[in-house]
Design a protein with these regions (language model features):
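Active-site-proximal loop/helix segment associated with metal-binding centers of metalloenzymes
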Residues: 16, 129-221, 227
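Active-site neighborhood of divalent metal-dependent phosphoester bond hydrolases
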Residues: 84-88, 93-121
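Cap/insert and terminal regions of metallo-dependent hydrolase folds
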Residues: 179-301
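Active-site metal-binding motif and surrounding structural segment of the metallo-beta-lactamase
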Residues: 40-91, 119-121
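Conserved beta-strand hairpin/beta-sheet module of binuclear metal-dependent hydrolase folds
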Residues: 1-49, 85-87, 150-152, 159, ...
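Divalent metal-coordination and catalytic microenvironments
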Residues: 6, 37, 46, 63, ...
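Active-site metal-binding loops of divalent metal-dependent hydrolases
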Residues: 11-13, 41, 64, 95, ...
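Short, surface-exposed amphipathic charged segments that create phosphate/polyanion-binding patches used
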Residues: 126-138, 304-311
Length: 311
């Protein structure tokens, strides 16, 4: 089974709140680890979950408000002290490179590993990163500083070989058959690919919408996403405050999920004024029942499917 799993490390907003850390998440795609935002205390949360820092391949920073990146410098330094040698790429707003350089210079630190900052795109749908596991595209969010969400979409898998037909396929042709080729036998008989293979699982998708005002223009990009994380800083009682600060209410997050036909909605970035997430959760579930309030230290698995589910 190929893993596609989200670990929530922090669910709080800007001000400290008992029991909540600032925003950070870890996405595991086929055992490759991608860190999404890095608020204060991220290292501690990673340690609690038994995550080896050195396995983190890339870091994605949505914007430069402190609750989303102030844990980054400590993590970079810890990787240095732990002997990291493999390159680390950080996708982030342009000013982050200068911030990191100033802090490294002030502490007299010369990293043992290559560190590269790649600037986030401005437009939704623009490519951020592609590897053999996942394709990442940008989501243009609406906030007080340049802010980018991220859509992680699994790369398509090959077709599977039918157990009752695999014996007729020569070893050297099996990869081609998995890619969709028909099989021609020695006597000239052509076996259609559909008789030899099973449909591959559908590519899975996770969307991360951090700090943003209500942005229905995101819906086309989010269409059919399996798991949507959307900030829900306030309830509708404070909709005016949400507009002023360019944040979202739980109801607005749920509306985005409903219109996008998302599989599940995960709420986060809870204001410290809410001692419990229940008011936010109840507000969202009234619009989109498949809503959960993100729990720190909890893993959310997106299972493989071979057909589209009608919710």
């Amino acid at each position: 089974m190929r893993r596609f799993e989200l670990l929530t490390l922090g669910t709080g907003a800007a001000l400290p709140a008992r029991g909540r850390y600032p925003t950070a998440q870890l996405l595991n795609v086929h055992d490759a680890l991608y860190l999404i935002d890095c608020g204060e205390g991220t290292q501690e949360r990673l340690r609690e979950q038994g995550v080896n820092f050195l396995r983190i391949e890339r870091i994605f920073i949505s914007h430069l408000h402190g609750d989303h990146y102030l844990g980054l410098q400590g993590l970079i330094s810890s990787m240095h002290l732990m002997g990291r040698r493999t390159p680390l790429v950080i996708h982030a707003p342009q000013p982050l490179k200068g911030i990191i350089d100033i802090q490294l210079h002030a502490s007299g630190t010369y990293l043992r590993y290559p560190l590269q900052v790649q600037v986030n795109p401005d437009r939704s749908g623009d490519p951020v990163h592609t590897d053999d596991r996942v394709q990442v595209t940008a989501l243009a969010l609406k906030h007080r500083v340049p802010t980018t969400g991220f859509l992680f979409r699994e790369r398509p898998a090959s077709r599977g070989l039918r157990h009752d037909r695999v014996a007729v396929i020569p070893h050297y042709l099996r990869d081609k058959v998995k890619q969709g080729a028909d099989l021609t036998l020695a006597d000239g008989t052509v076996l259609p690919n559909e008789e030899l293979t099973l449909p591959p699982p559908l590519p899975r998708a996770y969307a991360y919408c951090s700090d943003t005002a209500y942005a229905p223009e995101l819906v086309p990009q989010l269409q059919g996403v399996d798991l949507l994380y959307h900030e829900a800083t306030f309830t509708e009682q404070l909709a005016g405050r949400a507009r002023e600060t360019l944040h979202s209410t739980a109801a607005q997050a749920a509306t985005i999920a409903r219109e996008a036909g998302a599989g599940r909605l995960l709420l986060g970035h809870f204001s410290s004024r809410y001692k419990s997430e229940q008011p936010l959760l109840q507000e969202a579930q009234a619009i989109f029942p498949r809503t959960e309030a993100a729990r720190e230290g909890h893993r959310y698995t997106i299972v493989e499917r071979t057909h589209v589910e009608n919710f």
